Protein backbone atom coordinates (compact mmCIF):
# COMPACT_ATOMS: atom_id res chain seq x y z
CA UNK A 1 0.00 0.00 0.00
CA UNK A 2 1.39 3.40 -1.02
CA UNK A 3 1.59 6.49 1.18
CA UNK A 4 -1.34 8.19 -0.60
CA UNK A 5 -3.54 5.14 -0.14
CA UNK A 6 -2.57 4.89 3.53
CA UNK A 7 -3.41 8.58 4.07
CA UNK A 8 -6.86 8.07 2.51
CA UNK A 9 -7.54 5.45 5.20
CA UNK A 10 -6.77 8.05 7.87
CA UNK A 11 -9.71 10.11 9.04
CA UNK A 12 -8.79 13.74 9.72
CA UNK A 13 -11.03 15.92 11.89
CA UNK A 14 -10.81 19.53 13.03
CA UNK A 15 -9.93 20.07 16.67
CA UNK A 16 -11.32 23.13 18.44
CA UNK A 17 -12.67 24.26 21.80
CA UNK A 18 -16.05 22.69 21.04
CA UNK A 19 -15.01 19.10 20.35
CA UNK A 20 -11.83 19.08 22.48
CA UNK A 21 -13.61 18.10 25.74
CA UNK A 22 -14.90 14.91 24.09
CA UNK A 23 -11.38 13.80 23.09
CA UNK A 24 -9.38 15.42 25.91
CA UNK A 25 -8.45 12.17 27.69
CA UNK A 26 -7.24 10.50 24.49
CA UNK A 27 -5.29 13.62 23.49
CA UNK A 28 -3.58 13.78 26.91
CA UNK A 29 -2.66 10.09 26.61
CA UNK A 30 -1.22 10.65 23.13
CA UNK A 31 0.70 13.75 24.30
CA UNK A 32 2.30 11.82 27.15
CA UNK A 33 3.06 8.84 24.90
CA UNK A 34 4.55 10.96 22.12
CA UNK A 35 6.79 13.11 24.31
CA UNK A 36 7.71 10.86 27.27
CA UNK A 37 8.63 7.61 25.51
CA UNK A 38 11.03 6.56 22.80
CA UNK A 39 14.26 8.03 21.52
CA UNK A 40 13.26 11.68 22.07
CA UNK A 41 11.72 11.25 25.52
CA UNK A 42 11.56 13.88 28.21
CA UNK A 43 9.75 13.89 31.53
CA UNK A 44 6.36 15.62 31.58
CA UNK A 45 4.32 15.57 34.76
CA UNK A 46 1.03 13.88 33.82
CA UNK A 47 -0.83 16.36 36.06
CA UNK A 48 0.38 19.33 34.00
CA UNK A 49 -0.17 17.75 30.56
CA UNK A 50 -3.90 18.45 30.63
CA UNK A 51 -3.40 22.05 31.74
CA UNK A 52 -0.88 22.60 28.93
CA UNK A 53 -3.20 21.17 26.28
CA UNK A 54 -6.23 23.04 27.64
CA UNK A 55 -4.32 26.33 27.24
CA UNK A 56 -3.24 25.45 23.69
CA UNK A 57 -6.84 24.79 22.63
CA UNK A 58 -8.04 28.03 24.24
CA UNK A 59 -5.46 29.98 22.19
CA UNK A 60 -5.82 28.13 18.91
CA UNK A 61 -7.09 25.11 17.00
CA UNK A 62 -5.83 21.99 15.33
CA UNK A 63 -6.69 18.63 13.90
CA UNK A 64 -6.76 14.96 14.80
CA UNK A 65 -6.14 11.86 12.72
CA UNK A 66 -7.81 8.57 13.52
CA UNK A 67 -6.81 5.22 12.06
CA UNK A 68 -9.87 3.10 12.62
CA UNK A 69 -11.12 4.13 16.05
CA UNK A 70 -7.64 4.90 17.38
CA UNK A 71 -6.33 8.44 17.79
CA UNK A 72 -3.07 8.33 15.83
CA UNK A 73 -2.08 11.99 15.68
CA UNK A 74 -2.86 15.51 16.85
CA UNK A 75 -1.50 18.85 15.64
CA UNK A 76 -2.22 22.19 17.29
CA UNK A 77 -1.65 25.73 16.04
CA UNK A 78 -2.22 29.34 17.06
CA UNK A 79 -1.04 32.83 16.25
CA UNK A 80 2.72 33.22 16.70
CA UNK A 81 1.85 36.12 19.02
CA UNK A 82 1.17 33.48 21.71
CA UNK A 83 4.72 32.06 21.63
CA UNK A 84 6.60 34.14 24.21
CA UNK A 85 9.92 32.46 23.34
CA UNK A 86 9.97 33.43 19.65
CA UNK A 87 12.90 35.83 19.06
CA UNK A 88 10.83 38.38 17.11
CA UNK A 89 13.36 41.20 17.58
CA UNK A 90 16.02 39.11 15.81
CA UNK A 91 13.67 38.23 12.93
CA UNK A 92 11.87 41.42 11.85
CA UNK A 93 11.07 39.95 8.41
CA UNK A 94 8.66 37.48 10.05
CA UNK A 95 5.47 39.37 10.91
CA UNK A 96 4.41 37.79 14.20
CA UNK A 97 0.82 39.04 13.89
CA UNK A 98 0.45 37.37 10.46
CA UNK A 99 2.27 34.14 11.32
CA UNK A 100 0.83 30.80 12.36
CA UNK A 101 2.69 28.91 15.08
CA UNK A 102 2.36 25.13 14.95
CA UNK A 103 2.73 24.45 18.66
CA UNK A 104 2.38 20.66 18.73
CA UNK A 105 2.64 17.78 16.27
CA UNK A 106 2.32 14.38 17.91
CA UNK A 107 1.96 10.98 16.31
CA UNK A 108 1.65 7.70 18.19
CA UNK A 109 4.76 5.53 17.75
CA UNK A 110 2.67 2.77 16.12
CA UNK A 111 1.77 5.15 13.27
CA UNK A 112 4.99 7.08 12.66
CA UNK A 113 6.41 7.06 9.14
CA UNK A 114 2.95 6.73 7.56
CA UNK A 115 2.44 10.34 6.49
CA UNK A 116 0.21 11.35 9.40
CA UNK A 117 2.33 14.32 10.51
CA UNK A 118 2.54 15.54 6.92
CA UNK A 119 -1.23 15.16 6.49
CA UNK A 120 -1.91 17.18 9.64
CA UNK A 121 0.57 19.95 8.79
CA UNK A 122 -0.74 20.20 5.21
CA UNK A 123 -4.28 20.54 6.59
CA UNK A 124 -3.24 23.25 9.08
CA UNK A 125 -1.57 25.22 6.28
CA UNK A 126 -4.59 24.88 3.98
CA UNK A 127 -6.89 26.14 6.74
CA UNK A 128 -4.54 29.02 7.62
CA UNK A 129 -4.02 30.44 4.12
CA UNK A 130 -6.80 33.05 4.42
CA UNK A 131 -5.60 34.35 7.80
CA UNK A 132 -1.82 33.97 7.89
CA UNK A 133 1.05 34.67 5.48
CA UNK A 134 3.76 32.67 7.28
CA UNK A 135 4.15 29.65 9.51
CA UNK A 136 6.69 28.82 12.20
CA UNK A 137 7.33 25.58 14.06
CA UNK A 138 9.85 24.84 16.82
CA UNK A 139 11.63 21.46 16.87
CA UNK A 140 14.16 19.81 19.17
CA UNK A 141 17.47 19.69 17.27
CA UNK A 142 17.84 15.96 18.06
CA UNK A 143 14.49 15.09 16.44
CA UNK A 144 15.97 14.36 13.03
CA UNK A 145 12.84 12.69 11.54
CA UNK A 146 10.77 15.82 12.31
CA UNK A 147 13.47 18.14 10.96
CA UNK A 148 13.65 16.07 7.75
CA UNK A 149 9.86 16.19 7.31
CA UNK A 150 9.66 19.95 7.79
CA UNK A 151 12.56 20.45 5.37
CA UNK A 152 10.59 18.44 2.76
CA UNK A 153 7.59 20.69 3.44
CA UNK A 154 9.64 23.81 2.65
CA UNK A 155 10.57 24.96 6.15
CA UNK A 156 14.04 26.35 6.80
CA UNK A 157 15.81 27.22 10.08
CA UNK A 158 15.71 30.85 11.18
CA UNK A 159 16.69 30.83 14.87
CA UNK A 160 17.30 28.63 17.87
CA UNK A 161 16.71 28.86 21.60
CA UNK A 162 17.63 26.76 24.62
CA UNK A 163 15.00 25.40 26.98
CA UNK A 164 15.43 23.55 30.24
CA UNK A 165 13.37 20.36 30.32
CA UNK A 166 13.38 17.34 32.63
CA UNK A 167 14.87 13.90 31.95
CA UNK A 168 13.18 12.70 35.13
CA UNK A 169 11.69 14.47 38.16
CA UNK A 170 14.43 16.72 39.53
CA UNK A 171 16.87 15.96 36.66
CA UNK A 172 16.95 18.93 34.27
CA UNK A 173 18.68 19.00 30.90
CA UNK A 174 19.08 21.68 28.27
CA UNK A 175 17.30 21.22 24.97
CA UNK A 176 18.19 23.23 21.86
CA UNK A 177 15.07 24.05 19.87
CA UNK A 178 15.22 25.23 16.26
CA UNK A 179 12.63 27.60 14.85
CA UNK A 180 11.73 26.72 11.27
CA UNK A 181 9.84 29.07 8.94
CA UNK A 182 8.14 29.09 5.59
CA UNK A 183 5.68 31.30 3.75
CA UNK A 184 2.10 30.16 3.39
CA UNK A 185 1.30 32.87 0.86
CA UNK A 186 2.59 36.30 -0.04
CA UNK A 187 1.54 39.32 2.02
CA UNK A 188 -1.41 41.32 0.69
Task: Locate predicted features.
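Conserved N-terminal entry element of GNAT/NAT acetyltransferase domains
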Residues: 1-29, 33, 187-188
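Conserved acetyl-CoA-binding loop-helix of GNAT-fold acetyltransferases
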Residues: 107, 113-126, 148-152
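Active-site rim helix/loop that mediates acceptor-substrate recognition in acyltransferases
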Residues: 39-67, 76, 82
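Conserved beta-strand-loop-alpha-helix junction that forms the acyl-donor binding cleft
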Residues: 112, 136-147, 163-174
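Glycine-rich acetyl-CoA-binding "A-motif" of GNAT/NAT acetyltransferases
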Residues: 70-73, 145
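Conserved acyl-donor/pantetheine-binding loop and adjacent beta-alpha core of acyl/acetyltransferases
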Residues: 74-104, 164-171
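Conserved active-site tyrosine of GNAT-family acetyltransferases
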Residues: 31, 150, 155
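Helix-loop element at the rim of GNAT/NAT acetyltransferase active sites that forms part
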Residues: 28-44
Amino acid sequence: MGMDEAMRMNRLFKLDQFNYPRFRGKIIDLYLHAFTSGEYAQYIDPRTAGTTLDALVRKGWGNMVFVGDRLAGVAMAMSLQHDRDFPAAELPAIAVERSLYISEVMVHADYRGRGIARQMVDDLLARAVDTFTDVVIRVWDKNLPALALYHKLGFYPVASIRQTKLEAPGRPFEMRKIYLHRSIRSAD
